[in-house]
From Swiss-Prot:
Residues 20-299 form the Protein kinase domain. The modification Phosphotyrosine is found at residue 173. Keywords: Activator, ATP-binding, Cytoplasm, Kinase, Nucleotide-binding, Nucleus, Phosphoprotein, Serine/threonine-protein kinase, Transcription, Transcription regulation, Transferase. It comes from the Eukaryota. It catalyses: L-seryl-[protein] + ATP = O-phospho-L-seryl-[protein] + ADP + H(+); L-threonyl-[protein] + ATP = O-phospho-L-threonyl-[protein] + ADP + H(+). ATP binds at residues 26-34, 49. The gene is HOG1. This is Mitogen-activated protein kinase HOG1. It is found in: Cytoplasm; Nucleus. The lineage of its organism: Eukaryota, Fungi, Dikarya, Ascomycota, Pezizomycotina. The active site is at residue 141. One of its GO terms (cellular component) is nucleus.
Amino acid sequence: MAEFVRAQIFGTTFEITSRYSDLQPVGMGAFGLVCSARDQLTNQNVAIKKIMKPFSTPVLAKRTYRELKLLKHLRHENIISLSDIFISPLEDIYFVTELLGTDLHRLLTSRPLEKQFIQYFLYQIMRGLKYVHSAGVVHRDLKPSNILVNENCDLKICDFGLARIQDPQMTGYVSTRYYRAPEIMLTWQKYDVEVDIWSAGCIFAEMLEGKPLFPGKDHVNQFSIITELLGTPPDDVINTIASENTLRFVKSLPKRERQPLASKFKNADEQAVDLLERMLVFDPKKRITASDALAHEYLAPYHDPTDEPVAEEKFDWSFNDADLPVDTWKIMMYSEILDYHNVDASGASAAMGEFNGQ
């Protein structure tokens, strides 16, 4: 049975196995607190994310289960990787991943990025997205703070808690507003992997300019700012809007012409502007794919078609429509954790006590 030690971080109890020491707070998210720590087994620095009260509601339990399944399945150089997972005696879940030191948001707020860094970062983002999308997964919440970077400029996409199956009937607002694709704002109902390409385009623009491209104060203002640059959406896009209120709002806006991005990004080279034009397209089906973006001339210095892998198999989303009680999600979670630790999962419910120190 694992031995647990306790520490207070920002008034929150961190209850971790004795394998980890030197806890330091890194950041606080909506669903958990992240600390850095020293893994005494590997002598490496790691990040430990505490999921707060994962079994308090079926929705939270399912969300945590989804993130765990995704972290186990997605194995790629540009995706954050899971190195350990455990449940504390207080029934909080802890994900342990590699520690990268900083994120793109912090980099962008500290200094302008030079061209070669912008190229290399965008290349790695698109390389990661090619893999994620090939697994049948949409990240949905891509933003600079979810893109981790180390001192060697290695980049990894993190925070897959909101990720969802590729499904033409996806529902709900999810990503941070500045980076949110228009189809999410306009319809709520039909979106796919292309939302990640839009978000990556917004991040690309921010790397080029040093500030957010579409800093909307609210959803109405956000959409208005987008149309000022990209013009009024084409009729075939407008006709996909399911909400009558949204449809009326869009049709009430003044007609605007798309502005050439070269006039906005005067210091960027032609290839950068051309790729950005292909990413920031209203019609999702006309947006460039991650795979095609990697082959674009702008990313030629890094493009290697023999080293841009796709997933070996699609992610299994069969659980995603399930409406289950907390206790069932809990047993499924324990089963996944036992599987991760190469323990026979057939007795997951009986083994629950061992994993929370009972």
